Design a protein with these regions (language model features):
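Pseudouridine synthase
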Residues: 30, 98, 128-180
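Long, intrinsically disordered, low-complexity Ser/Thr/Pro-rich regulatory/activation regions
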Residues: 177-195
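Beta-rich strand-turn-strand
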Residues: 142-143, 190, 195-201
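Residue-level recognition of short loop/turn positions
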Residues: 101-102, 140, 184-185
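A short beta-strand motif that forms part of the nucleic acid-binding face
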Residues: 18, 57-58, 68-69, 138-140, ...
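Short beta-strand segments
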Residues: 94, 118-120, 144, 187-191
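RNA pseudouridine synthases
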Residues: 1-119, 126-129, 172, 198-207, ...
Length: 217
C-alpha cells in the first residue's frame, strides 16, 4: 500500500517510495488501491523518494500540467552531496542534453537540437564529515537535472553512482516540498514531507526541522 498524505475528488498526494517508477508502476498501484483512474502530471526518478501529486481525472491533469508549464507549480528538494560549495547559496544554470539510449544527461557548452536550459537554486544548510545538506529549488524540470548539475561541479549526490558518487547506497535526494493551485477550487495547496529514517539524513536531523527549513528561502 502506498502512503497517502491527502486525497479529494481531483488529486491525491503520496509519499513516493524508492524503486517504483511514477509513469507506470505507481499509477497502477494507486488505481488498484483507490479504484479509480490515475493521471501522472510530474515525475521523480525511480530511485528518488518524496512527495508527489497525481490527478484523478483528465481535467485536473490538464490544469496541473499547464501550471507546471507556466511555472506555477513549485518543487523543492533535499540532497546530501559529496564535499561542499564555496558559495552558501547560488543559482546554477547549464545547458543539458539527455541521451535517451543511455538514459543519461550531460552538461554541454553549446545550444543544439535536443539541448535545453536548466536552472536551479540551492542553499547549503550545513556540512558534516565532508558531506553537505542542500535545500534545492527546481526552476526547470529536465531529466536528471539536479543530479547532473551538482555532479558537473564535482559535488555528486551521495549514492548516485550514475553521476559519479563513490557511495553504493541509496541516492540521498528527496522531494521535500510541492506547491500548486488546486485545479478545482483554486486554493493554494502546500505539502511538505521529511525523509523517512536514513542513516545519512539522520546525521543532519537537527537541520531537518520543518520550521527551520521554511525560513531558508
Amino acid at each position: 500500500m502506498l502512503e497517502i498524505i491527502y486525497k479529494d475528488t481531483d488529486i491525491v498526494i503520496i509519499r513516493k517510495p524508492y524503486g517504483l517508477d511514477c509513469q507506470y508502476q505507481i499509477p497502477q498501484f494507486l488505481k488498484q488501491q483507490l479504484n479509480c483512474d490515475i493521471y501522472t502530471v510530474h515525475r521523480l526518478d525511480t530511485i528518488v523518494t518524496g512527495v508527489m501529486v497525481f490527478c484523478l481525472n483528465q481535467k485536473s491533469a490538464a490544469i496541473l500540467s499547464k501550471e507546471i508549464t507556466e511555472k506555477v507549480f513549485k518543487k523543492e528538494y533535499l540532497a546530501i552531496i559529496e564535499g561542499c560549495f564555496k558559495e552558501q547559496q547560488n543559482r546554477l544554470t547549464d545547458l543539458l542534453f539527455h541521451d535517451k539510449r543511455a538514459n543519461k544527461t550531460y552538461v554541454v557548452k553549446k545550444k543544439r537540437k535536443g539541448v535545453k536550459e536548466a536552472l536551479l537554486e540551492y542553499r547549503q544548510l550545513c556540512s558534516i564529515n565532508n558531506n553537505s545538506l542542500l535545500l534545492i529549488r527546481l526552476l526547470t524540470g529536465r531529466t536528471h537535472q539536479i543530479r547532473v548539475q551538482l555532479a558537473s561541479r564535482s559535488h555528486p549526490i551521495i549514492g548516485d553512482g550514475k553521476y559519479g558518487s563513490n557511495d553504493n547506497g541509496k541516492i540521498q535526494l528527496f522531494c521535500y516540498h510541492i506547491s500548486f493551485v488546486h485545479p478545482a477550487n483554486q486554493m493554494v495547496m502546500d505539502f511538505k514531507l521529511l525523509p523517512n529514517q536514513s542513516l545519512l539524513f539522520d546525521t543532519f536531523k537537527n537541520h531537518l526541522k520543518e520550521g527551520e527549513l521554511c525560513e531558508k528561502y
